[in-house]
Amino acid sequence: LLKAHPEFAEVLIDATEQEVPQPTDKLKRKHAYSGKQHDHTIKTQIVATKDLVLHVFGGLPGSLHDMTVLRASGVMYRIPLAVKVRVDKGYEGTENAYPEADVQAPIKKKRGQKVTTLGKAYNHLLSVLRMPVEHHFARLQKFGCLAGLWRGPQSGHEDIFCVVSGLLNFRATGRFELA
């Protein structure tokens, strides 16, 4: 999609989690447990612009770190070098892992130090610029299948996420109007 639309100057990457029933198998239970959500979840990552969801990668266990999901998706290799990539604190180390990419990540405090006033201002500006990806998640979660407990097969979660994202993209481009 980025090749078809070279006008995209920036993309936003973020991940969300959706609650799943507690697996009966002990190993699956361990992999599905998200320490962040304190529940068993499925993780999905999106790459979006201000208006459109460009890429969905998910159906992964909630225990995975955001950076691990980013590496597994391989999406950073498909983003042109001229495009800015904005990420949140969950993607710490993206600048080092992909030095050729133009990655903008928040400044985290180092052990025993504080974030400077300039660093705090930068983080605030970055969070404001990243707000559209959070709005995408809010719109996606208006669909009941993505809002509450996911009871379907883990393998089908990414497909449903893609379908709902496509519907929202049609609506955003004016080609489709939801009743």
Task: Identify the meaning behind each predicted range.
Residues 1-179:
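Short, well-ordered secondary-structure "scaffold" segments embedded in the functional core
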